[in-house]
């Protein structure tokens, strides 16, 4: 089936067709870098990194741009508070942002432009808008005149006439209409400033993205993404000024991800088919913003609030378990549920290693869908039922991703694929007598390669899971204690003191530690 995407602009799913066949241009609004990145800053990049992965897997050549806003009122205020320069603060916070993206496996960004590097391009657009009558200078500032754009409000569904109802035609600051927004801001003493035809100043927020997207991706881009909270006014204003400048559609598809909100519980790894597809997108936006995770918890550095307690792999799995347009219930309880849910994936990887002697993480897998299709043509097999189940789960996963990048449903398919592989290992006794069964071994490798291929699309299972120690306990010390207990239990069993051995196992179980006896020895793991 063809890829279909839900565009906020049309409020419906559409067949994905790009401006240039075989190529995708994608722009995601990045952060204003005035403080350390929090978990909310990570949602969009992880989602759109996954979208790029799937589009590339589907055969597209994708160019993905994520901007950095390195000049803004917030940056100026924060730099003054800290007694540093805007440039130094922006550099430091940008590196923090990039470090967090790398930690989460977001490695597909092709261009990360800084707003201050595109001042000339911004001024060219502003001059063009003035010339066409869409903008006007005012006391060193330049404003976009919203009433001159007959389509203003089409993205958010807001009616400009209703927005202006009850307001005076001219506002006290001289703007023609209250809705008019700044394209250029005259500078104040001590603020960053660039020369312009309208006097020294700096760009408005919205013009930055229009200029960078146009310069790097062209007049019309395929996908414009961002959080639902950016739909209005930021994306609405981007669209208005860009289309007024070029006379062309700014973006073919507008994709908005849901916002983080305080955890309210729920199942991890389900379909999560309910998501933000309301015809009234502004109502959806306001509903999510009312529950948006903010304040001390939401704004806390992601390194402090999350990565000290949970492996980043868990965070990425967690975000994949929900459709990107859905609001995301976030909290330590949800991450703990995710950790517990995905533990089985890593146990499967361990079982695979014991059964085949192969390293899961170095398995070669197809990079594209067309390459993968070649290995899934119908063939006679001694394990026909198993092979058919693998093929069906592969189709289910890909159908989910074709349906507006539904990672929630795709993740559910991955869980079921894990069950199928575990059952095959058990039925064929591949960790025991069945190790000599070359046909079954090959079938398992084939299935696990599919498992890895699909996991790669989601950007998960990149490395072994790192368990975070509760209360900062020393992992090496804890492991040494566990090995001592395992040794004492083994001696008790050897001496036929089974009551003592069982007491050790039971006590550890109560502490949420599981012992697993294997031919090569006993291993332990801490349950989430």
Whereabouts are the PLM-identified features?
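Short, glycine/charge-rich beta-strand/loop segments that flank catalytic centers
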Residues: 68-72, 93-97, 107-122, 140-149
